Curated annotation (Swiss-Prot):
Name of a matching Pfam family: N_methyl
Gene Ontology CC terms, in alphabetical order: membrane
Organism: Aquifex aeolicus (strain VF5)
Protein name per UniProt: Uncharacterized protein aq_1436
Keyword Membrane on entry: yes
Residues modified to N-methylmethionine: M5
Length: 276
């Protein structure tokens, strides 16, 4: 004969149901917390990787295409050359140190052999025809004049095509910024004027970011926020080096990256050493 559950059996079943429900609740709750923590830490590791990769891009170009011969580390376009092409300046602002150096991040052209009576063959990469893009004309390892993209007359120059030399041609006579002319010869170079590269921190939307700015010639700086940080310390290497004469060959950055998730703050401090 079938009969219903007794009161005790009902209470036991209810208790087991509550225990199972609580177990599932806390399991889902804490798995969500652990997942959130893992995601926050994973993001921090990615911040550090991104920062190192981006900063390395600029340090690989430190000193490239930079004239020298001035009395200090100041560079001003067109003729205020720094004392040494590997000059580096360290400053500080708030929680972060600042690093400034000079380098070419864009176009160049190397004059090769004669193509015809009006042009030379050339190896070129990332050249432009913009009148606001400035270039130094180099002869025997020093700039002799200044020109602009629209005065050079480059044909071709796709640096994405590897193994093809020459990949461009250039006029033998180049009009300069002061309305004169320069006659090119084999071995001469036309190189985009160097940029002032600054690594620093400042706020964006109320949050402190590691940033890089590039400033070319008489143009305004172009700022690129990289990742959120709490602080950054920079040390010139080797320690005690003279930053004005090329003795400093690297910088050690100690950067504390930050990731805020709700009311929680996660940080990761990493040393990054970059140089030329």
């Amino acid at each position: 004969m079938n009969r219903g559950m007794t009161l005790i059996e009902l209470l036991v079943a209810l208790a087991l149901s509550i225990i199972l429900s609580l177990g599932l609740y806390y399991s889902f709750r804490y798995s969500g917390i652990f997942f959130s923590q893992d995601k926050a830490i994973s993001d921090l590791i990615e911040y550090a990787r991104t920062a190192e990769e981006q900063l390395k891009f600029y340090f690989d170009r430190w000193g490239n295409g930079v004239p020298e011969g001035g009395t200090d580390c100041t560079y001003s376009f067109p003729n205020g050359y720094p004392k040494n092409r590997f000059c580096i300046i360290k400053g500080s602002s708030g929680n972060c140190d600042e690093i400034i150096f000079y380098g070419n991040t864009q176009g160049f052209l190397i004059v090769l052999d004669e193509k015809d009576e009006d042009e030379f063959n050339a190896l070129a990469c990332r050249m432009t025809n913009d009148e606001d893009d400035y270039y130094y004309i180099w002869k025997e390892d020093k700039p002799v004049d200044t020109t602009t993209g629209n005065r050079i007359g480059v044909s071709g120059g796709d640096c994405g095509i590897k193994g093809i030399i020459p990949n461009a041609s250039v006029a033998k006579e180049i009009n300069t910024l002061d309305k004169g002319t320069v006659t090119l010869q084999t071995g001469d170079a036309i190189i985009r004027v160097p940029k002032i590269i600054k690594i620093y921190c400042s706020e964006t939307n109320g949050e402190l970011y590691l940033k890089v700015s590039e400033q070319e010639a008489n143009k305004a700086p172009v700022e690129s926020p990289l990742v959120p940080v709490k602080e950054m310390e920079a040390t010139l290497l080797p320690e005690g080096c003279d930053p004005t004469n090329g003795e400093c060959t690297a910088v050690r950055f100690r950067i504390t990256f930050v990731n805020r998730v709700g009311n929680e703050e996660y940080t990761l401090t990493k040393d990054i050493v970059l140089g030329r």
